[in-house]
């Protein structure tokens, strides 16, 4: 018998057959490694298109080789992207209620009534602090999901349908958008375009003056010189002293009225710096004398029972939104005022831009704060009832003779007889009707403004030695107008004419 190989040799040979030697493997060419498939394979072409029988065309879900791509197909993923979040109506309500820079009286709410459709009411007319189930009949409340939009002075600042948010700046794909707090310093609220707003240190127009008005830093801004700000002197009283009266801090009479003109002029710049721009404008400090301030505000402008220093940090009261005025319609009086304005331009040519147009000549008798068309309609009815009630003491005719310079910025003609008592009775009647009227610390002094320089301007009006003709300088007192205050650069808007008879 032949000899058998050792057991170990047999095992080694068997392993050599099963596993090739490393040298043998090195002689073989290496196969290229395929890259891992990270992208899914493209879908197969539409076989019906290849056969010429596809009826879907561009709507087909399978690719069509050689067919042009439909326009807008690349933008489809963006169109289906998630919209940026929009702050809810509840957020806007809380912001309006608790932000000290916002006045709830400046806002109105549009909501859906199940029976009447979309309605709009002032923000302050709603009850926001109680659940709906706890409210009884006669209380205006609305679920937050029925709120459709918010308006600020008639402008849309939050809208659910168009995803507009100018309160928080949400809803914009580019991030935080503009808000009413970021707008430039303007003054009016009605009829303005774009993002010109009046808030946070600028003039405001609102409905009512609630008790929290002492915390609102609201003042008047610059106004077009050709348009008189209604009740400019009376509004200055309210802005400068109304809030200070709430805080129990009023300046003593000697601070302004008891100082001579020569003593006041050297300290005018210093006082302007201490009070700041808005307070100094309201007080008429730049170039203003004690005598002109006394003539502007009247001797009763400073209450005797509260004689403390005027708080320089006291914010200004919000501006009125509407006013009641006697419009100058007599052609003879308009012609006399035009002659006075021409004489003013002849004496001071730089004052040509500050003349009040003849169509805007008026005397302000009452200042109101209204919000929305509903309150405007109610104000028209209340004004009609107030004028028809006896005891108004309205003179049949007014005459104008002298031109009075009220400070360095206002040239006016006071009427004869005066209208202080009539304006006071009218404001009391309107307030009794439930309207929000602005009451100045002293009496109102209605006057016919001939020229007016905006606050903050360095231009001073000169004193004129001009007298209006007594024969033609008259205006019958037969009708009054309810007007809406316009924004900066625009005139006021007459809303209703009401006869006194």
UniProtKB/Swiss-Prot annotation:
Keyword Metal-binding: yes
Zn-finger segments (C3H1-type): 40-67
Residues forming coiled coils: none
Alphabetically ordered keywords of this record: Metal-binding, Zinc, Zinc-finger
Molecular function terms, GO-annotated: zinc ion binding
UniProt-listed InterPro entries: AKAP7-like_phosphoesterase (IPR019510), Cyclic_Pdiesterase (IPR009097), Leng9 (IPR042653), MJ1316 (IPR040459), Znf_CCCH (IPR000571)
Keyword hit for Thylakoid: no
A Pfam cross-reference name: MJ1316
SMART domains: ZnF_C3H1 (SM00356)
Region called Disordered, residue ranges: 1-43, 61-86, 203-234, 281-300
Descriptive protein name: Leukocyte receptor cluster member 9
Organism in which the protein naturally occurs: Homo sapiens
């Amino acid at each position: 018998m032949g000899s058998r190989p050792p057991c170990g040799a047999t095992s080694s040979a068997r392993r050599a057959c099963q596993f090739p030697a490393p040298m043998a493997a090195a002689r073989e060419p290496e196969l290229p490694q395929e890259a891992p498939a990270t992208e899914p394979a493209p879908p197969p072409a539409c076989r019906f298109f290849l056969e010429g029988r596809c009826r879907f065309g561009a709507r087909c879900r399978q690719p069509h080789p050689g067919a042009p791509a439909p326009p807008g197909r690349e933008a489809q993923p963006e169109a289906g992207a998630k919209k940026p979040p929009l702050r809810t109506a509840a957020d806007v309500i809380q912001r309006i209620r608790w932000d000290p820079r916002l006045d709830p009286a400046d806002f109105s709410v549009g909501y859906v009534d199940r029976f009447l459709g979309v309605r709009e009411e002032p923000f302050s007319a709603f009850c926001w602090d109680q659940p709906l189930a706890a409210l009884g009949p006669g209380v205006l409340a609305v679920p937050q999901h029925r709120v459709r939009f918010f308006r600020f002075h008639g402008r849309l600042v939050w809208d659910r349908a168009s995803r507009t948010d100018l309160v928080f700046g949400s809803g914009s794909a580019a991030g935080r958008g503009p808000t009413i707090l970021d707008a430039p310093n303007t003054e009016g609220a009605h009829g303005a375009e774009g993002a010109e707003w009046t808030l946070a240190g600028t003039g405001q127009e609102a409905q009512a003056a609630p008790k929290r008005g002492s915390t609102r830093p609201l003042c008047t801004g610059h106004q077009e010189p050709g348009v008189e700000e209604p009740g400019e002197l009376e509004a200055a009283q309210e802005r400068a002293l109304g809030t200070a009266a709430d805080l129990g801090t009023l300046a003593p009479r000697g601070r302004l009225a008891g100082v001579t003109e020569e003593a006041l002029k050297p300290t005018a710049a210093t006082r302007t710096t201490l009070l700041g721009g808005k307070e100094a404008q309201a007080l008429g400090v730049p170039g203003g004398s004690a005598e002109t301030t006394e003539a502007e505000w009247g001797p009763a402008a400073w209450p005797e029972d509260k004689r403390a220093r005027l708080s320089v940090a006291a914010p200004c009261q919000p501006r009125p939104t509407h006013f009641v005025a006697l419009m100058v319609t007599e052609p003879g009086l308009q012609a006399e005022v035009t002659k006075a304005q021409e004489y003013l331009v002849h004496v001071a040519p730089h004052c040509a831009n500050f003349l009040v147009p003849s169509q805007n000549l008026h005397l302000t008798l009452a200042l109101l704060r209204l919000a929305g068309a509903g309150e405007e309609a109610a104000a028209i009815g209340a004004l009609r009832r107030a004028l028809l009630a006896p005891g108004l003491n309205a003179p049949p005719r007014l005459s104008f003779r002298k031109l009075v310079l009220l400070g360095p910025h206002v040239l006016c003609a006071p009427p004869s007889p005066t209208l202080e008592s009539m304006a006071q009775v009218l404001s009391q009647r309107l307030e009794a009707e439930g309207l929000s009227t602005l009451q100045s610390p002293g009496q109102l002094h209605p006057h016919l403004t001939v020229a007016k320089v905006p606050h903050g301007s360095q231009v001073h009006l000169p004193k004129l030695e001009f007298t209006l003709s007594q024969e033609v300088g008259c205006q019958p007192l037969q009708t009054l107008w309810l007007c809406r205050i316009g924004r900066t650069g625009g005139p006021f808007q007459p809303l209703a004419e009401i006869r006194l008879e």
